[in-house]
Amino acid sequence: MNYVSKGTELRLAIKELVFDYMSNSPVCGAYADGLKQAEIFRQCGLDWGEYPNATSSNQQYWIVALLRELESEGKVQRDIDSKKWRIK
């Protein structure tokens, strides 16, 4: 098995899941308030629960790169003041 290819495939699938969720969530609409990254993370089922040194709050930080990639593609935007994410 090529683990790098499989990892890339999984990242792309999760990126698609997050974008699909945001596209279909009224709270993340272009003119809506948006959601914090932790809320998006949990609503997409990506939270593994609470573990020592891996709390739910710590786990959600990896989604930052995913949201920044969607932002670089012109698909989402982050409100500067509220720090919430929404569809662009």
Model-predicted regions and their roles:
Residues 81-88:
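Short, cationic-aromatic polyanion-contact patches
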Residues 71-80:
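A short, conserved structural fragment
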Residues 39-41:
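A short acidic, leucine-rich amphipathic alpha-helix
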Residues 1-34:
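Short alpha-helical segments that sit at the start of domains
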Residues 27-33, 45-63:
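Short, positively charged loop/turn segments that connect secondary-structure elements
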Residues 64-68:
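Short, hydrophobic-biased segments on the C-terminal half of alpha helices
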Residues 51, 80-81:
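Residue-level detector of family-conserved "landmark" positions at structurally sensitive sites
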